[in-house]
Each structure stands twice: as structure tokens, then as C-alpha cells.
Amino acid sequence: MIKNNKSFHDFSTTTLQGKVFELNKLKGKKVMVVNTASKCGLTPQYKGLQALYEKYGSDEFTIIGFPANDFLWQEPGNNDEIAAFCTKNYGVSFPMMQKISVKGSGMDPIYKWLTKKEENGVSDASVKWNFQKFLIDESGKWVDVIGPRDEPDSEQIINWVKGED
């Protein structure tokens, strides 16, 4: 049973810089939501995420990163340290949100929506590890989940971004 008819666009969050980020300003864009970590074997995916954003990021597509320390304490930094790491090491220019929890009792409401069918109306999809990717369509509906080990330039992701899925 679906609890509510919330869409992704009904939420707001906070950037690494402490500014409110209303997700309703993303209406009309495809969005890839990624939980990130600075000290993970998958951290180099930041490079691929940034390349994807530079190539396809526009009025039609964006990426949002959510740093989280839920898997083996691989994101120990505070928001300022995370921002500096992302800029210095990967030149990240896609929106990065404040550090949150993506699982357990402290799970952020956006991730409750992303991971629970009763919230998103489509599918249950627990977060398996850092750099799991959730795909959201232009109207704020949950589309798919892509595993952490799948690179940002995977055929599945590129085809979805280009509308060839």
C-alpha cells in the first residue's frame, strides 16, 4: 500500500554550503541521485560522475550527490571537508548535498522515498553500498536503481540520460 503520492520534487534538502535546495526546481529534468563517500574503493567514480555531468548536464539532466558515512565509516569528513575534497580531487560541479544517512533509523526522508515502495509507489531498493545510483524521471517519479559498481558511463545510464532506454 502506498502511503502517499509524494514525488521526488516534493522534497527539499540542504547543500554542502548550508543552502536550502528545493527539488521542485528540478521539474522537467532527469535526475541521478548518488550516495557518495571520500574514502571508498569506488570514490574514483566521482571522476565519471563529473564527466557525465559535463557532457549531459543541462536543462534536461542533472546529478545530485549525497555524502553518507553509512558503510564502514568511509565518509568521515564534515560538510566543508567533503566540499574541499570533491573540488580539489575531482572538480565536482554537480550539486552536492550535506552529509546524511542513507539507511537505518536515521535515514534521510529523501532516501526513505528512494528505497521504499510504500513511499515511491514503484519499488523497494535498499542501498547496498556507496555510489548506488537512483534514476528519477522529469516528473519526479522513481525509474530505476543502478548498482554501486556500475560506472557512471555505463551503457544503461547513458541510454537513459539520452532517452534511448
Predicted features along the sequence, with ranges:
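N-terminal "domain-start" segment that seeds a small globular fold
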Residues: 1-24, 44, 109
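Conserved helix-turn-beta segment immediately C-terminal to the redox Cys motif
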Residues: 29-30, 39, 43-67, 87-90
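Thiol-based oxidoreductase modules, predominantly thioredoxin-like and allied folds used
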Residues: 35, 60-78, 93-104
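Residues that form or flank phosphate/diphosphate-binding pockets in enzymes
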Residues: 44, 73-74, 105, 152
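Extracytoplasmic/secreted proteins, especially bacterial periplasmic and envelope-associated proteins
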Residues: 48-51, 77, 81, 109, ...
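Short, internal strand/loop/helix patches
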Residues: 80-128
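Thiol-/selenol-based redox modules, centered on thioredoxin-like
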Residues: 112, 116-165
